[in-house]
Amino acid sequence: MEALDKRIIYFLQLENDLEPVGAQSVSQLFNTRRKIAIVKKHIIQYQSERILLKGRIEEIQKDIDEANASKRKLLHKESKICKRIGLIKRNNFAKQLILDELSQEDMKYGIR
């Protein structure tokens, strides 16, 4: 984008420098006008390229924003799943402790 901006500025300055000053011959005026037309063509070309690039950058930024939103949703779901897994593991561990304690008491009193 910066390179295109610099080109546009360069050609705008060139266009201003080419403006005829003082008395000139007809052929010089036509030559100058032709050069100005070429410069204007370049200016329009670079400005349109800049507009196209800016539009493409906006599209890419929109895609990035959508991807980030999806990533946040997935991370949130992953967090919920991890919390549930943690609760299940904790509950299973607590159950196992209770079962171990009960089996120790059963062995203490001779019950299998």
Swiss-Prot record:
InterPro entries according to UniProt: Salm_SPAgM
Any Pfam family: SPAM
Keywords: Plasmid, Virulence
Source species, domain of life: Bacteria
Similarity section: Belongs to the SpaM family.
Task of the protein: Required for surface presentation of invasion plasmid antigens. Could play a role in preserving the translocation competence of the ipa antigens. Required for invasion.
Entry protein name: Surface presentation of antigens protein SpaM
